[in-house]
Amino acid sequence: MKQYLELLDYILQHGEDRGDRTGTGVISSFGHQIRFNLEEGFPAVTTKSLAWKGVVSELLWFLEGSDDERRLAEIRFQKDRSELTDLSRFSTIWTDNADNQGVELGYENTATTKKLGPVYGVQWRDWSGVDQIKKLINDLQSNPNGRRHILSAWNVEKIDSMALPPCHVMSQFYVSTNGRLSCQMYQRSADMFLGVPFNIASYALLQTVLANVLNLVPGEFVHTFGDAHIYKNSIEQVKEQLTREPKKLPKLIMPNLDSIDALNEYSVDDFILEGYESHPALKAPMAI
């Protein structure tokens, strides 16, 4: 994860002091790229702890195509939503978005249902009737040399109906002649401290899941950034993180899948980071 830390340092040293939508203020820099070879280990941040079950549950939720934050809570905590009404114990990274932007948009918001609109999972699994995930898998199987293996969440017609427009906008997949599946993701807006370690792990996991279904080996994950920023309320945490020495990357252990639908048979506990060790947690408030 050295490249990630180097980018944090670069933004601190060379970024612009800017205002932002949340009113928090940021140090921002535009147009960057980092790369990870998944054969060398799973790119989980070690200079602070990674909320791994949060990563897994969100991806499973995306792949279900859900628009309900309380469904994410069910996946994360493995309980029925009727048992998850205490948000001090059973909130998710999408709870604040549902309770703020979702409510502003007029979506249903109760103790057991918190709608977000046509967010990532809806676009992935039902973009005007198109299941992008199944199409992507079919296209990678039938035409591995193709240059149209795209997964997109940026549905312009629906942007204003989403509780949060997509930050990680699109990804492209590439099958090399040696049987490696690589992925490049473009992120228009990147919270470098809180969000990006989560995003790296999420797309590396998606890439590995797709490689598993396709009987390929995960290759490179390439992360391309538009507006890469550090919120002013996390500057001190970033400085502390940069003093820490990265630890050895873990290995991802997951079930063998014969189809993407087979994911329905598994839970967050079936995806394990073997050998994962990290420095203590570093916390900062999420700017919404």
Regions found by a protein language model. Give the residues of each.
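Terminal, non-catalytic protein-protein interaction segments that mediate quaternary/complex assembly
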Residues: 1-288
